[in-house]
Amino acid sequence: MPMQKLILVVLFFMNAFTSIKAQKNNDEQLAMQYYERKEFDKAVVYFDKLYDKLPDAYFTYYYTCLIETKDYNKAEKIIKKQIKRNPTATNLYVKLGKIYRLQHNPDKEKEQYTKAIKEVIPEQNYVFVLAHAFEDEELYDYAIEVYMKGRKNQKDTYPFYYEIADLYKKKGDLKAMINEYLDAIEFRESELYTAQANLQQSLGYDDKNGGFNNPLLKQELQKRIQQHPDKTVFSEFLIFIQNQQKDFEGSFVQNKALDKRQKGDGTRLMELAKLCVSNEKYDVAEKCYQYVISKGKDNPYHDVATIEKLNANYLQLTTSVNP
């Protein structure tokens, strides 16, 4: 082939390639413009072409357009195609289930959700993707079921306590939410402060008016203490709440029980007594000091407790005489 003809052929293919690329870029720009404007009836025309060329890249956009334009049959078709291409992407079954829900076919909808949970690989990343797919559709019970399956497989590494707790919160089941956070603390005591922070955010926390506002937390903590007396972290958590709420009688009971269990020297009771005095709860302060005194003269706090008890008694008398 003469050089001149060869150059012409090369130029022809270069121009053709450039033209095709420019057309693709133009289609993509128009598709995204219409999509962002929520003009799905116009966007779907372009995504139809783009999806044929790069199905994985444009699937989500195309699927959304088909749902918004109520072309459920075509949406069903492309999802099934994607499932064949990506059999481990069980979140696609959730999208398929959504189509059946929109078509008022609850049996087929449920079938897809059940299949998704059955086939999901119970590893952290796969579990997250499927659970989030259910959560995006506000199918919280299914999302919880996914995490529970993941928990069975990863119970010693990452049991999904925080994710499940958040879902119970969204469902309005505060008791179940609280118990997930308490399970996290039981699983690993170092989770206390993270769980505490999440509970403060979820239950409401007012430092000026007694800390945690919801009585459910105290109730569930008391149950845990009875069930697991060896887990002192629950007693510490309850004491923290009682002190915040100025429930010093309750705090005295818990501190005394904890001191006995740990065969302590009364340090925690001495600290509570100071807190009681500063809040003018002299009767509870006297109980704290008396408990320490009862440990005997060999206790390092015996003499201090004796003096401080007299001081608390004096303050109580003078305060009641001169309110």
Residue ranges, per PLM feature:
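Acidic, polar-rich low-complexity tracts and alpha-helical solenoid repeat scaffolds
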Residues: 23-323
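Sec-dependent N-terminal signal peptides
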Residues: 6-14
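Alpha-helical transmembrane segments and their juxtamembrane interfaces
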Residues: 14-15, 284
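N-terminal secretory signal peptides that target proteins for export/translocation
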Residues: 1-3
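Sec/Tat signal peptide C-region and signal peptidase I cleavage site
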Residues: 18-22
